[in-house]
Amino acid sequence: MVRAGAVGTHLPTSSLDIFGDLRKMNKRQLYYQVLNFAMIVSSALMIWKGLIVLTGSESPIVVVLSGSMEPAFHRGDLLFLTNFREDPIRAGEIVVFKVEGRDIPIVHRVIKVHEKDNGDIKFLTKGDNNEVDDRGLYKEGQNWLEKKDVVGRARGFLPYVGMVTIIMNDYPKFKYALVAVMGAYVLLKRES
């Protein structure tokens, strides 16, 4: 068995020396790698904006952050949303909504809908795993949600795929390390 650092062993340090690799690149290679990285980022942004237009939702993909919707959805499930204004809101539907004063949208089921003669709709939500409805989550004095509060309606999901997002939010250093590693990979990757 050979131990790291033992006499006569050689550990390759060139793969670990990121700045040394950057210094070895000529300006054209470095420019190409930075441009490649910028194209990846801009492509991701264009895909996101395209999804916003196609789905009608300001946030077409969301992650379930709590267990309040179990057994329908679990913490870490990735939800795909649509939000077409002409679609009526129905009891039993799962919606993602924003509440004034809260930064993070909430994923819950519509349990009651009240429609007025003029077409205005008000509705009440509740998490499947919660004992009481969501009136305690709404802003003070608000008893019902309106269509303007809806970010989207759940149309599909991928189980547990969003756990990466939860881990990155729970452990911010992991998020920065992951971004740094991906950025270094893109910058240092050389065409064969």
Curated annotation (Swiss-Prot):
Enzyme class: hydrolase
Cytoplasmic side: 1-28
Active site positions, chain numbering: S68, H108, D134
Record-listed E.C. numbers: 3.4.21.89
Coiled coil start-end: none
Transmembrane helix as UniProt keyword: yes
Protein name in UniProt: Signal peptidase complex catalytic subunit SEC11C
Species: Rattus norvegicus
Organism taxonomic ancestry: Eukaryota, Metazoa, Chordata, Craniata, Vertebrata
